[in-house]
Amino acid sequence: MSSRRQFLISTSAAAVLPAAAAMLAVSSKAWASDAPISDAELQRQMLAKLNVELNDSTIASTEAPYLQDIFFSWDLPSIPVAQIGAIVAYSFGDRPAAASGANATSGTGQSQLPQPGPINEEIADAVHQLVQSKPVMVYAQWEVASVLTAKYQMSSANLQSIKPPTVASNGTISYPALDDVAAAIIALQGTAAALGTVAVVTHRDQAKRAIQTSRAHGMNAYAAQGVTLPVDYDAQASQPANRRRDLYLLNDMMNQFATLRASLIAQQYPNG
């Protein structure tokens, strides 16, 4: 967890809405310039605006670092390929199984497991590229692992498939969360330390949260330097939020806030 997350977050909607407004209200003069303002100047202006909106300088000082991290910090911690001890690949969406008669408009009402789809194929391509440079064990979520097996003939010698979605009798599909996948990977090895230094491969917009989740489970997780992560979106994805970047980013930031909120509540009130 980043040190900036070690404060108590306000959980009221009254705090969140002005905070979002503050993000959009950062100096019009600064936005008019081609050069982005510095992180320090951004935080100064956010603090000033939040203090006006909330009329509480203490709370503004607490909330601003969270907003700056979640809204404005998307860089990834990275390591050289030579330092990688294992690869962890998280999937990103999927496509409805054509054989089941389902399509993107039918949502999760399917009679069989979905198809990996083009984005997970791109993630698998990135994993394969990395394996060529550093042949280590790959722990890949099912959608990615299925492509690695079919397209690149990877086997149990260097690939472990993790957590497929489940299809209920009524056609409802349940997808594992990043937390579930990370926990399942560690269960295979017994400890996170046994994985060594981990390179996380997934969609670029999910990578920050995927690395944070991996670290929360004890993994020494990073992005791999020199590996280009997928940035495309699939308009035919089963999940509506995964079809467009604007929708996905809102979804991802919401999940970051939810994780932060749960963590801070657990820290402050461990007994409930």
Locations of the language-model features?
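A structural signal for short, hydrophobic/glycine-enriched beta-strand patches
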Residues: W31-R244
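C-terminal segment of N-terminal export signals and the immediately downstream linker at the start
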Residues: M1, A22-P36
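N-terminal secretory signal peptides and thylakoid transit peptides that target proteins
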Residues: M1-A15
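Sequence-pattern detector for short linear motifs
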Residues: F7-L8, A32, L264
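Bacterial N-terminal signal peptides
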Residues: P18-A19
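C-terminal capping/extension of enzyme domains
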Residues: D232-G272
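Residue-level detector of solvent-exposed, low-hydrophobicity positions
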Residues: A14, L24, A97, N255, ...
